[in-house]
């Protein structure tokens, strides 16, 4: 099988690494890819926003299957255009990708189909949103409706913080993503990420993970795209997974189909496990970044036939087998992230991978043959262990061998699970 992978982040490096191991693979291309992905795939300098160019390349190379990694091309309808050209594609349609592309769309779906989630209101102007906040009080959550690279959500612990977040959205801090705002109830509990495939009819539960959104140790500082993750998430017991499937995922699949937007691809449900049970915080319509890295480390099965079955409506014919081990990833980011940071800082050394640990590339590039950091989140150091404690020790041991002066990381990834393991 000839496969084209769209994307250039740590998530796509993990997908490329896993897809390349498949005995079914004849050729793997990645557009645009990164220097880490180049170890597993032929890099193609395609502009993925130019759908006609992507289709032309796929036809020229007789590509059998396209896997779309990031959310932006999905929300832009790349999967629709590829499928219309007769090319099997992993990833939802533009209409179904609204589950991630619009927070309000998802909340309205939850309201229609009785999916547990926090109470909410949608606003297109600042003043009514502020009136609502004053009436509700804090803590309260303010979300830019559209795609904001994981940074459009403010969990406001005070009313003043909530009002400032509303101003940020309507003053253009998140571009067009903030032209509408969702204000929702603060949910108290433990967060978890749940991943599940759907071909529009069948659902296949994958695995659970826990992400670390805030930039600083002890979950302090501003939100980021994610500073690290581990899998499995202990809070997601088999009973909780079953409830999540029954109360959240299955009604979403049937609801989307009923509304004329059948969903094919991966559901990444951001959940809050409250006293009542699982409640939906948000949906993403692609593998998490950095959660994908820990999922791929734990997946025993060949990934390629599972993705292909999702794309071709035959998900009921495949299964996914997982290692019992835990996996943990630590994000190395550029100093200053998620604010302003220096670009093109040199990365002097990346340590060799072992059976237990490896480094995935995210925001890296080659400049004059030398590896440099081009993004905010740059490397993902990922390791296995019998438990999270062991996986964490291995990940930090490898992370400390990376030679990059402008990099930093959180030192406490996995702290909640480790506290549980010690107890």
UniProtKB/Swiss-Prot annotation:
SUPFAM superfamilies: Glutathione synthetase ATP-binding domain-like, PreATP-grasp domain, Rudiment single hybrid motif
Catalysis performed (reactions): 5-phospho-beta-D-ribosylamine + glycine + ATP = N(1)-(5-phospho-beta-D-ribosyl)glycinamide + ADP + phosphate + H(+)
Annotated binding of Mg(2+), by residue: 282, 284
Classification via SMART domains: GARS_A, GARS_C
Binding site for ATP: 133-193
Recorded metabolic or biological pathway in which this protein acts: Purine metabolism; IMP biosynthesis via de novo pathway; N(1)-(5-phospho-D-ribosyl)glycinamide from 5-phospho-alpha-D-ribose 1-diphosphate: step 2/2
Co-factor remark: Binds 1 Mg(2+) or Mn(2+) ion per subunit.
InterPro entries registered for this protein in UniProt: ATP-grasp (IPR011761), ATP_grasp_subdomain_1 (IPR013815), PreATP-grasp_dom_sf (IPR016185), PRibGlycinamid_synth_ATP-grasp (IPR020561), PRibGlycinamide_synth (IPR000115), PRibGlycinamide_synth_C-dom (IPR020560), PRibGlycinamide_synth_C_sf (IPR037123), PRibGlycinamide_synth_CS (IPR020559)
Every ATP-grasp domain range: 107-312
Source organism, top-level taxon: Bacteria
GO molecular function: ATP binding; metal ion binding; phosphoribosylamine-glycine ligase activity
Cofactor(s) required, per the database record: Mg(2+); Mn(2+)
GO biological process: 'de novo' IMP biosynthetic process; purine nucleobase biosynthetic process
Enzyme Commission number: 6.3.4.13
Record's keyword terms, sorted: ATP-binding, Ligase, Magnesium, Manganese, Metal-binding, Nucleotide-binding, Purine biosynthesis
Similarity remark: Belongs to the GARS family.
Name used for this protein in its record: Phosphoribosylamine--glycine ligase
Organism: Agrobacterium fabrum (strain C58 / ATCC 33970) (Agrobacterium tumefaciens (strain C58))
């Amino acid at each position: 099988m000839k496969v084209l992978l769209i994307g250039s982040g740590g998530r796509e490096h993990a997908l490329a690494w896993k897809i390349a191991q498949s005995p079914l693979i004849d050729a793997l291309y990645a557009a645009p890819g990164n220097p880490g992905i180049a170890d597993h795939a032929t890099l193609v300098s395609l502009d993925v926003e130019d759908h006609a160019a992507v289709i032309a390349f796929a036809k020229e190379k007789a590509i059998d299957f396209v896997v779309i990694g990031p959310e932006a091309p999905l929300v832009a309808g790349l999967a629709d255009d590829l499928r219309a050209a007769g090319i099997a594609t992993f990833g939802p349609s533009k209409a179904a990708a609204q589950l991630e592309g619009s927070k309000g769309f998802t909340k309205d779906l939850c309201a229609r189909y009785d999916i547990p989630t926090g109470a909410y209101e949608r606003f297109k102007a600042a003043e009514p949103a502020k009136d609502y906040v004053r009436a509700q009080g804090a803590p309260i959550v303010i979300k830019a409706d559209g795609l904001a690279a994981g940074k459009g959500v403010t969990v406001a612990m005070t009313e003043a913080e909530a009002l400032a977040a509303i101003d940020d959205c309507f003053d253009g801090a998140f571009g067009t993503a903030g032209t509408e705002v969702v204000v929702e109830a603060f949910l108290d509990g433990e967060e978890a990420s749940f991943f599940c495939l759907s071909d529009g009819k069948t659902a296949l539960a994958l695995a659970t993970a826990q992400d670390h959104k805030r930039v600083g140790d002890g979950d302090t500082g501003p939100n980021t795209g994610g500073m690290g993750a581990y899998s499995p998430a202990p809070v997601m017991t088999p009973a909780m997974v079953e409830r999540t499937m029954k109360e959240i995922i299955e009604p979403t699949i049937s609801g989307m189909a009923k509304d004329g937007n059948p969903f094919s691809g991966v559901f990444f449900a951001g959940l809050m496990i409250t006293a009542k049970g699982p409640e939906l915080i948000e949906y993403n319509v692609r593998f998490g970044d950095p959660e994908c890295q820990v999922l791929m480390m734990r997946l025993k099965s060949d990934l390629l036939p599972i993705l292909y079955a999702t794309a071709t409506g035959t998900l009921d014919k495949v299964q996914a087998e997982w290692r019992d081990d835990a996996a943990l990833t630590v994000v190395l980011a550029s100093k200053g992230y998620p604010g302003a940071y220096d670009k093109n800082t040199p990365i002097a050394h990346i340590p060799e991978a072992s059976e237990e640990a490896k480094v995935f590339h995210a925001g890296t590039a080659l400049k004059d043959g030398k590896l440099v950091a081009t993004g905010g989140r740059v490397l993902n150091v990922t390791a296995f262990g019998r438990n999270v404690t062991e996986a964490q020790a291995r990940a930090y041991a490898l992370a400390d061998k990376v030679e990059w002066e402008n990099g930093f990381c959180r030192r406490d990834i996995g702290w909640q699970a480790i506290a549980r393991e010690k107890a």
